[in-house]
């Protein structure tokens, strides 16, 4: 992560800006985490090809300190993200009698995966080896944003094989698969706008949230927006990542 430190700190008047904020409430829906980052899949003759949209920064697994109900409760207490989306690129046909399969080959220990919801698999169902689930899923070609989570913050990655297989997932002879690796950035507290860089935009964004007593400026997570949060953010900003 690049660091571009501002040389001058912004002043504030604590007495005018101290404000209490309400504790986190029960959230209705989990957050995707940012702009969609597509994993494009297409057929080139007897081969499947994949390409990740690199115009969108690497996602960050984030803990929003929220509580979710129902099936989404599997994300409670985790750092999670759902920006990666499998999507078919162009127009092409699957070989007769075949389906598209996505299989996890390897990954950082502790990375959990849950279905984004398909015609056959309800949302938040464990997939890709999570909770003893199969390492592969069948994909119908519709845009699919699965949920990726971890109980500890950090950089994570997972490598997948996309291939043509029969109804049981056995690869079809004569067709080449595609291998693709998805990555998630290490969470950096000073990257306020979560664009993957630390610069003046982060400082300005935090200062604006602080002045508005926005809960997003509760840097230390104690339920209040006050000088302790400003000092904490300033220290993290100067330290970089």
What are the language-model segments listed below?
Residues 144, 152-156:
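Short tyrosine-centred short linear motifs in exposed loops/low-complexity segments
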Residues 2-13:
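Bacterial N-terminal signal peptides that target proteins for export
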Residues 13-22:
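Bacterial N-terminal signal peptides
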